[in-house]
């Protein structure tokens, strides 16, 4: 039986108390299950206000793919800050260079349009599709951010008078076909988020073909998978060529940038659709993305994180079995999640707290996201995981 480590979170507690009085962020601080305030990171480790160190399994919602404060990315960003970050004209050498790199990454694509967040990119893609097709409605499945068009998937967030132009088909292929058979002439686009551990490639190929049959643009929300999957994103692995993909997380190793990468039929509607903003041409994001893409390609990060993810996933499954805990770990390559459906109520919260005490920062209700540098700490990670299970 392991002993319960006692960590000092006193400075973090005072900071959280003060913060809750003047600012708020329900993700993930407000619910109180993270007693620490993270202040810096290096490689796979993050550090809190009290000086405690943790191995990071969140990858900052999956946005950090290489590792925190990767020197090559830091240097690129520092160079930009000494030159100025935002200018009135959008054209810049860095924007052009990044657009060309993205067209190489997704070789079927013709243009790239840049934004700041994944939510912005997917919302832009939906509106661009409406203008490109002259149709109004969107069929979607999966999570696409917080913007209004997607509120059909989050009914508790909808204002009382809100009417969405998007309809969720919840990955139900029969419902999807039915909607398109009955309303295909109204559907501008189908927007899907890949869930590789739940559906095979044939499923996504069928979604794509049915959309094409009805003249609907097909958009793959690769905000999380676009760079974790390697060149071509998940779309290439699935053997499909969409009309557009949206990308963000992992592209700039934690810096804010996103893009719609697609066919000119869709992207040429930019001016008429009015989907641009002041900050979409920040140089910091371009520089961070270029440096990150150099690293991803030079070190074959997708292959490394796939191997690491599978090693950690199998190790975690073995530990659960050794402790007699009915917890699954469905996943795909560089990311996996924990399945507590057959476990006792409250186990997820208890495990998360135990892991934190043993120096693993994670969210048991979300994906475990591998970073490139996680490979250097696989044994340590599993040792800490085993110690945490011993505390339950």
From Swiss-Prot:
Q: Key word Cytoplasm present in the record?
A: no
Organism of derivation: Streptomyces kanamyceticus
Catalyzed reaction equations: neamine + 2-oxoglutarate = 6'-oxoparomamine + L-glutamate; 2'-deamino-2'-hydroxyneamine + 2-oxoglutarate = 2'-deamino-2'-hydroxy-6'-dehydroparomamine + L-glutamate
Which cofactor names does the annotation list? pyridoxal 5'-phosphate
Q: Which GO terms describe its biological process?
A: kanamycin biosynthetic process
Protein name (Swiss-Prot/TrEMBL) = 2'-deamino-2'-hydroxyneamine transaminase
- Which purpose does this protein serve, as stated in its record? Aminotransferase that has 6'-oxoglucosaminyl:L-glutamate aminotransferase activity by catalyzing pyridoxal-5'-phosphate-mediated transamination leading to the conversion of paromamine to neamine in the biosynthetic pathway of kanamycin B.
Any Pfam family from its record, for instance, is: Aminotran_3
Q: Which domain of life is it from?
A: Bacteria
Keyword vocabulary terms for this entry: Aminotransferase, Antibiotic biosynthesis, Pyridoxal phosphate, Transferase
| Pathways involved | Antibiotic biosynthesis; kanamycin biosynthesis
């Amino acid at each position: 039986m392991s002993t319960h480590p006692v960590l000092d979170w006193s400075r973090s507690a005072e900071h959280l108390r003060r913060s809750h009085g003047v600012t708020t962020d329900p993700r993930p601080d407000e619910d109180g299950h993270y007693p620490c305030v993270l202040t810096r990171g290096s490689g796979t480790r993050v550090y809190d206000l009290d000086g405690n160190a943790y191995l990071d399994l969140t990858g900052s919602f999956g946005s950090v793919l290489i590792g925190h404060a990767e020197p090559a990315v830091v240097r690129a960003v520092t160079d930009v800050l000494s030159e100025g970050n935002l200018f009135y004209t959008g054209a810049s050498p860095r924007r052009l260079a990044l657009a060309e790199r993205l067209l190489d990454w997704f070789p079927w694509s013709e243009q790239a349009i840049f934004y700041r967040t994944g939510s912005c990119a997917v919302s832009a893609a939906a509106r661009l599709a409406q203008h490109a097709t002259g149709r109004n409605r969107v069929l979607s499945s999966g999570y696409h951010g917080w913007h209004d068009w997607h509120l059909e998937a989050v009914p508790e967030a909808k204002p009382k008078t809100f009417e969405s132009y998007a309809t969720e088909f919840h990955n139900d292929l029969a419902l999807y076909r039915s909607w398109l058979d009955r309303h295909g002439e109204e559907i501008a686009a189908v927007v899907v988020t890949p869930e590789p551990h739940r559906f095979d490639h044939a499923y996504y190929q069928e979604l794509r073909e049915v959309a094409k049959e009805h003249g609907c643009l097909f958009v793959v929300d690769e905000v999380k998978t676009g760079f974790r999957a390697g060149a071509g994103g998940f779309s290439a692995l699935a053997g499909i060529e969409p009309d557009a993909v949206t990308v963000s997380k992992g592209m700039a190793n934690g810096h804010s940038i996103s893009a719609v990468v697609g066919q000119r039929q869709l992207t040429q509607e930019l001016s008429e659709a009015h989907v641009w903003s002041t900050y979409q041409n920040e140089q910091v994001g371009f520089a961070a993305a270029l440096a990150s893409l150099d690293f991803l390609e030079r070190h074959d990060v997708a292959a490394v994180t796939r191997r690491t993810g599978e090693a950690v996933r199998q190790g975690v499954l073995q530990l659960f079995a050794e402790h007699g805990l009915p917890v699954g770990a469905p996943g795909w390559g560089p990311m996996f999640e924990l399945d507590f459906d057959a476990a006792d109520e409250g186990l997820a919260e208890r495990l998360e707290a135990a892991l934190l005490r043993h120096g693993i920062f994670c969210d048991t209700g979300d994906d475990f996201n591998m970073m490139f540098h996680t490979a250097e700490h696989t044994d340590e990670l599993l040792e800490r995981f085993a110690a945490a299970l011993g505390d339950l």
